């Protein structure tokens, strides 16, 4: 994976370890360095990616989807202040509907032109891919030009598993309904 994209993902992930989490700059830099190299070495170039909290402990999970595979990266145990080694856990799973589940809770906001509201959808995607389970909360706005990375990743996963048609969840379909 290209270093520019890798650097952006690693920086987004290490933001979870910021000052509120009582990690020093040195610890965060070591985590960032390890993630950059793990992503560069083990994440394919043509991947759809997102970073989000996982496991309810404030730890980031970096996920990628490409070629019917899911790639997951995390730091299971952040290093201590004087520990030079950072362990990055890398997992790769084949997207097999027999070993995967997708659930979604959807809520829609009806537009109200008087208040400038637009149609939007909030979704809490829940995935189980072999032994990896995670939630992806997302939001889609009808007036938005793009899709947030977490929504793009969730759609890519659901489409790869064949549980939703390719056109059912995109922003264009929200605009057409409005």
For the regions a language model picked out, list residue spans one by one:
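Canonical pleckstrin homology
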Residues: 101-177
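Anionic N-terminal interaction surfaces
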Residues: 1-63, 67
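Generic extreme N-terminus detector
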Residues: 4-6, 89, 178
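A sequence-composition feature that detects small, non-aromatic residues
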Residues: 10-15, 34, 38, 50, ...
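Phosphoinositide-binding peripheral membrane targeting modules
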Residues: 51-122, 133, 160
